[in-house]
Swiss-Prot record:
Segment forming the signal sequence: 1-19
Protein name: Taste receptor type 1 member 2
Keywords assigned by UniProt, alphabetized: Cell membrane, G-protein coupled receptor, Glycoprotein, Membrane, Receptor, Sensory transduction, Signal, Taste, Transducer, Transmembrane, Transmembrane helix
Glycosylation: residue positions: N84, N292, N312, N363, N423, N482, N522
Species of provenance: Cebuella pygmaea
Topology, Extracellular side: 20-561, 619-630, 698-722, 777-779
Transmembrane residue ranges: 562-582, 598-618, 631-651, 677-697, 723-743, 756-776, 780-800
PANTHER family on file: CALCIUM-SENSING RECEPTOR-RELATED, TASTE RECEPTOR TYPE 1 MEMBER 2
Length: 834
């Protein structure tokens, strides 16, 4: 005997022991094809019956559940409606066998009863392909733990099972449960609807309470996994003790409830998510009322989201706002009247089983009928659609047309294949099973109301599992002062432009710190760090974006620019006048003593240098930068080198020619002055080229250290570092020129240029050193204007300081610009030396 046969044999033994006879037409209806129904009419939360107990629990000994009877009535209503429908299963009568499963206590015996044949025998066979059990399909039960227990039995025979409210994602495993389907969205959609609700109201600090059974543990774990690393944090999670509302509470369980409620009181989290069966919550909420815990937002899982008995608990409305996640309401015409209709008169002669009695069900339902009627048909529709799914599958399997069906034996494996294929419209809703065996019904967020004139479970929003978001969110009557939305945050939301500094282990607990100037907060990328603005942008403190810095450069309308331009124009005119005066007296001794042709070279370069001044104004370009960094320095260096060589040549004539006649003759013969100027010019060109290669010509920008909102655009990004290198040759020439001028202070008056050269060279040396010092300590917007001003002053020092006195002598003392006068001055100098 194989393992499968031994298993079936054992089940047969249990079935033979557990079977008994009871008659009640409320639970049984004969028909051509029977449906099995498993409902919780009474609930036993603690008394779990194990397989080694050979007595079936008597469900009527436990507390009655109105909602369970309401669902059983939905199945009866659907079967009766189908039997009266001439278009669906014409000429075929559906029957049913329904059993009370006591929540989780009575699952095995009904499963065996449904699997057995009419004689209560379950034969041992090698092949069950042609086996016909008592029922063709089973509707229920309601909770995931019971569904899995029953499914393990039914799946051995591929007997179709459709659950109407079990949401565990474990039920999607078709390797374990190939014949199991459900007409309710899976747990992940319920969890996601909760999360979207909390995100909508900015609740990021919550408490979670779970029951100690599989339902509570699994859903609590799923919620924790969904929230891990997200925007919502769990302040704490506690496990509720398993309690029966009509049983005396044990001291340890009571102390546990007291501790949990005290923890809720002390927590700053005002939103409480509860995953638990309804019967486990009665004593808990009694303790909540006893401790006067108010102002909370209770988010109910689908297991108690629309429970009428818990809703009727006295004073419950004082504890806060109740929001529940449940299946959408689909009104079923005629069901409200059918729900309170009594059982059919007279016993039946058909064989039934135990736990098919509920003496108080109808009266209890009548007492809650108003609440049930106003709350609408939610899970009721899931039962209703499950029955219709089986009916449509049978309709297809029996080859029915509009008037007749071919009645024949229906095997479970055939029917389950047809159920997977069904696709029909029921009360304007499309019913079909996805690859996981679920029907994608919408979910609703309901608010509990205690005004008898309103729906006790008022819909405030809907959730589409296919879209994954809430919609049609309505106003909520908050149980708070001034009807304000409750706040449940570990930390208040940061203001715009503030970064989060984590506090503790929860991501929802943080300090808010302002972003510093020059940084901004990009919340889409990183809420915990301020990002630096790009180099050409800036921001104030606590900003979420940067703005463009204002580019700073010399402009013509500025007063400083106009003043410097006027000085440059004055220098240009003076240099042009000096060139005209020198050209008019080109053969005169005064011009020849000033350098002759070299004098015209200097004046020409000075004019060019003055013409370069305007390129300092306006935004720098490659061409203007080339003029600033190459053309002007070369021109100025040639001018200084000419002055230096002129000083050296005069000293040579009067003091060194007699001592070194041969050297002097070589100097004169090979034009030593021009060769020296050419060499110095070449050296300057090399210096400029090296500087340009090191720094480049492209204009660059830098932030103003005094005003970060300003971006200074300049030619040389390392101007301060290269300034001393670029001017080193000029400074050396100025020192040498000053030295030669000082050596010639005793020369004839017409050749004594010590005062003028000393003035020019000293001014240049002092201004250049001052500029280097200034730029080493300051890097603001004044650098360019100071640089230009020093440049113009240096040009003026040469133009006016060196050429000015000579022009003055040519214009106002022409008698001194004669060869005779110069010869007399030389003779006087010679006589003094002798």
């Amino acid at each position: 005997m194989g393992p499968r046969a031994r298993t079936v044999c054992f089940l047969f033994f249990l079935l033979w022991v557990l079977a008994e006879l009871a008659e009640n037409s409320d639970f049984h209806l004969p028909g051509d094809y029977l449906l099995g129904g498993l409902f919780t009419l009474h609930a036993n939360m603690k008394g779990i019956v194990h397989l080694n107990f050979l007595q079936v629990p008597m469900c009527k000994e436990y507390e009655m559940k109105v909602s369970g009877y309401n669902l059983m009535q939905a199945m009866r209503f659907a079967v009766e409606e189908i039997n009266n429908d001439s278009s669906l299963l014409p000429d075929v009568l559906l029957g049913y066998e329904m059993v009370d499963v006591c929540y989780i206590s009575n699952n095995v015996q009904p499963a065996l009863y449904f699997l057995a044949q009419e004689d209560n025998l379950l034969p041992i066979q090698e092949d069950y392909s042609n086996y016909v059990p008592r029922v063709v399909a089973v509707i229920g039960p309601e909770n995931s733990e019971s569904v899995m227990t029953v499914a393990h039995f039914l799946s051995l025979f591929l007997l179709p099972q459709i659950t109407y409210s079990a949401i565990s994602d474990q039920l999607q495993d078709k390797q374990r449960f190939p014949a199991l389907l459900r007409t309710t969205p899976s747990a992940k959609h319920h969890i996601e609807a909760m999360v979207q609700l909390m995100l909508h109201f900015h609740w990021n600090w919550i408490s979670v309470l779970v029951s100690s059974d599989t339902y509570g543990r699994d859903n609590g774990q799923m919620l924790g996994d969904r929230l891990a690393g997200g925007d919502i944090c769990i302040a704490f999670q506690e496990t509720l003790p398993t309690l029966q509302s009509n049983q005396d509470i044990m001291p340890e369980d009571h102390q546990r409830l007291v501790s949990i409620v005290e923890k809720l009181q002390q927590s700053t989290a005002r939103v409480v998510v509860v995953f638990s069966p309804d019967l486990s919550l009665y004593n808990f909420f009694r303790e909540v009322l006893r401790q006067n815990f108010t102002g909370a937002v209770w988010i109910a899982s689908e297991s108690w989201a629309i429970d009428p008995v818990l809703h009727n608990l006295t004073g419950l409305h004082r504890t806060g706002t109740f929001l529940g996640i449940t299946i959408q309401n689909v009104p079923i015409p005629g069901f409200s009247e059918f729900r309170v209709r009594g059982p059919q008169a007279g016993p039946t002669n058909q064989r039934s089983t135990c736990n098919q009695e509920c003496d108080t069900c109808l009266n209890s339902t009548l007492s809650f009928n108003t609440v049930l009627r106003l709350s609408g048909e939610r899970i009721v529709y899931s039962v209703y659609s499950a029955v219709y799914a089986v009916a449509h599958a049978l309709h297809s399997l029996l080859g029915c047309d509009h008037s007749t069906c071919t009645k024949r034996v229906v095997y479970p494996w055939q029917l389950v294949q047809e159920i997977w294929k069904v696709n029909f419209t029921l009360l304007d809703h499309q019913i079909f099973f996805d690859p996981q065996g679920d029907v994608a019904l919408h979910l609703e967020i309901v608010q509990w109301q205690w005004d008898l004139s309103q729906n006790p479970f008022q819909s405030i929003a809907s959730y589409n599992p296919l879209q994954g978001r809430l919609k049609h969110i309505q106003d909520i009557s908050w149980h708070t002062i001034n009807n304000t939305i409750p706040v449940s945050m570990c930390s208040k939301r940061c203001q715009s432009g503030q970064k989060k500094k984590p506090v503790g282990i929860h991501t929802c607990c943080f300090e808010c710190i302002d972003c510093l100037p020059g940084t901004f907060l990009n919340q889409t990328e990183d809420e915990y760090d301020c990002q630096a603005c790009p180099s050409n942008e800036w921001s104030h403190q606590s900003e979420t974006s940067c703005f463009k810095r204002r580019l700073s450069f010399l402009e013509w309308h500025e007063a400083a620019t106009i003043a410097v331009a006027l000085l440059a124009a004055l220098g240009f005119l003076x240099x042009x006048x000096x060139x005209x005066x020198x050209x008019x007296x080109x053969x005169x001794p005064m011009v020849r003593s000033a350098g002759g042709p070299m004098c015209f070279l200097m004046l020409t370069l000075l004019l060019v240098a003055y013409m370069v001044v305007p390129v300092y104004v306006g935004p720098p370009k490659v061409t203007t930068c080339l003029c600033r960094q190459a053309l002007f320095p070369v021109c100025f260096t040639i001018c200084i080198s000419c002055i230096t060589m002129r000083s050296f040549q005069i000293v040579c004539v009067f003091k060194m020619a007699s001592r070194f006649p041969r050297a002097y003759s070589y100097w004169v013969r090979y034009q030593g002055s021009y060769v020296s100027v050419a060499f110095i010019t070449a050296l300057k060109v090399v210096t400029v080229v090296i500087s340009l290669l090191a720094t480049g010509l492209n204009p660059t920008t830098r932030a103003d250290t005094d005003d970060p909102k300003i971006m200074i655009i300049s030619c040389n990004p390392n101007y301060r570092n290269s300034l001393l290198f670029n001017t080193s040759l000029d400074l050396l020439l100025s020192v040498v020129g000053f030295s030669f001028a000082y050596m010639g202070k005793e020369l004839p008056t017409n050749y004594n240029e010590a005062k003028f050269i000393t003035f020019s060279m000293t001014f240049y040396f002092t201004s250049s050193v001052s500029l280097c010092t200034f730029m080493s300590v300051y890097d603001g917007v004044l650098v360019t204007i100071v640089d230009l001003l020093v440049t113009v002053f240096n040009l003026l020092a040469i133009s006016l300081g060196y050429f000015g006195p000579k022009c003055y002598m040519i214009l106002f003392y022409p008698e001194r610009n004669t060869p005779a006068y110069f010869n007399s001055m030389i003779q006087g100098y010679t006589m003094r030396r002798d």
